[in-house]
Amino acid sequence: SVGFKAGVKEYKLTYYTPDYETQDTDILAAFRVTPQPGVPPEEAGAAVAAESSTGTWTTVWTDGLTSLDRYKGRCYHIEPVAGEDNQYIVYVAYPLDLFEEGSVTNMFTSIVGNVFGFKALRALRLEDLRVPPAYSKTFQGPPHGIQVERDKLNKYGRPLLGCTIKPKLGLSAKNYGRAVYECLRGGLDFTKDDENVNSQPFMRWRDRFLFCAEAIYKAQAETGEIKGHYLNATAGTCEEMTKRADFAYELGVPIIMHDYLTGGFTANTSLALYCRNHGLLLHIHRAMHAVIDRQKNHGIHFRVLAKALRLSGGDHIHAGTVVGKLEGERDITLGFVVLLRDDYLEKDRSRGIYFTQFWVSLPGVLPVASGGIHVWHMPALTEIFGDDSVLQFGGGTLGHPWGNAPGAVANRVALEACVQARNEGRDLAREGNEIIRKASKWSPELSAACEVWKEIKLYFEAVDTL
């Protein structure tokens, strides 16, 4: 009979299309799916495609008013995960028309929305996303990008050095500014507000901005180098956030900061637009990422959050260290470091890269290595991250036995020694300790730092493995 046939039918009849040839304009997703016992992988994969696009649990007569074939997500390939009993990588293609232009918020609401609470799945993780140029071109991306940042700062041929001001909470604005000045004066390029420093009773944002600006200008005048402090503009409302960004702009400082996951993608994209229009660099902190990305079988992998940030906009983003106190398995970390910086990234499953990604001319983002790192890590960091990165030593600067400025000196000397050694063709991985030891002979500050941290090890097995 012709017409509407009510009732529940299997998702795979509509949404599992193994013969589908993906289009250049499709957004492609790779999900790690753990079905409930008794649910076949084809049905689970089709359910993911359906629930994250046009489907619902039963046939509805309004399906007849549109062309499902044009708008539905399609599960086009399924492969079992090696070494796991009941896990599959499910590939889904979404037609571009399902998404609003220039909105990470809308893209995520579909792809990682309700489907994650779906009962037929025991767990679901979004491992990777291919954003086609047709979609990425609808975004502004980072306010400035790597090359423009180097030109603004007049710093070339080496990683940039930063430091998070500690104790993260409790300092008055004046003492905070003093710590900023000492670090910048000692040789760092940047200092940083901690991610949870917004505007609390012990230090209101306006006071902090003023004292930090004073510190920046004083350090610049004395060193002849351009300096910056990531002024955290994150706030409870977008209007308040913009007000803080405005004040930073009026002070003439080079860079501000945002917590993009807690602040949200809508706020972040607005701030990135503001920064481009006002010539401010934007540093992005990823507080809350581990809630989303740390479980191996459920959530969203950080490489997807990193791609989303490059679309939404930011000039720096924290990306793990490989060697410090926070997560980061080497190959996987390098995978999303390349994805943040480069125009083009080949599919490479050994790095967890499921799709070839072509960013066309979207500016790049500097990866920030931060968390439990100190001078002995400098050779490894220089080798792993290369020149286009920011190396941030919080405790590794402020924990120096002689104080903040000598801590900054130690880090700058160590970095310059590593860069020089690398440029001379030496092997940082093999000769790193020797390079640091030699440099410490003519730098008492570095020598003292080497002594303090020579025994420190923060080794646990990485959770983020393939």
Curated annotation (Swiss-Prot):
Positions carrying N6-carboxylysine: 192
One of the record's GO molecular function terms: magnesium ion binding
UniProt KW Membrane keyword: no
One cellular component (GO) term of this entry: chloroplast
Catalytic class of the enzyme: lyase
Superkingdom of the organism of origin: Eukaryota
Residue ranges of coiled coil: none
Residues involved in Mg(2+) binding: 192, 194-195
PTM sites of type N6,N6,N6-trimethyllysine: 5
Mod. after translation: The disulfide bond which can form in the large chain dimeric partners within the hexadecamer appears to be associated with oxidative stress and protein turnover.
Record's cofactor remark: Binds 1 Mg(2+) ion per subunit.
InterPro entries (UniProt xref): RuBisCO (IPR033966), RuBisCo_large_chain_AS (IPR020878), RuBisCO_lsu_C (IPR000685), RuBisCO_lsu_C_sf (IPR036376), RuBisCO_lsu_fd_N (IPR017443), RuBisCO_lsu_N_sf (IPR036422), RuBisCO_lsuI (IPR020888)
GO BP, sorted A to Z: photorespiration; reductive pentose-phosphate cycle
EC number(s) stated in the UniProt entry for this protein: 4.1.1.39
Annotated CDD domains: RuBisCO_large_I
Cofactors required: Mg(2+)
Cellular compartments annotated: Plastid, Chloroplast
Catalytic activity, reaction form: 2 (2R)-3-phosphoglycerate + 2 H(+) = D-ribulose 1,5-bisphosphate + CO2 + H2O; D-ribulose 1,5-bisphosphate + O2 = 2-phosphoglycolate + (2R)-3-phosphoglycerate + 2 H(+)
Active site (UniProt): 166 (proton acceptor), 285 (proton acceptor)
Site (Transition state stabilizer): 325
Subunit structure, as described in the record: Heterohexadecamer of 8 large chains and 8 small chains; disulfide-linked. The disulfide link is formed within the large subunit homodimers.
HAMAP family for the chain: RuBisCO_L_type1
Its job: RuBisCO catalyzes two reactions: the carboxylation of D-ribulose 1,5-bisphosphate, the primary event in carbon dioxide fixation, as well as the oxidative fragmentation of the pentose substrate in the photorespiration process. Both reactions occur simultaneously and in competition at the same active site.
More about this protein: The basic functional RuBisCO is composed of a large chain homodimer in a 'head-to-tail' conformation. In form I RuBisCO this homodimer is arranged in a barrel-like tetramer with the small subunits forming a tetrameric 'cap' on each end of the 'barrel'.
Family the UniProt entry places it in: Belongs to the RuBisCO large chain family. Type I subfamily.
Protein name per UniProt: Ribulose bisphosphate carboxylase large chain
The species this protein was found in: Drosera binata
Gene that this sequence comes from: rbcL
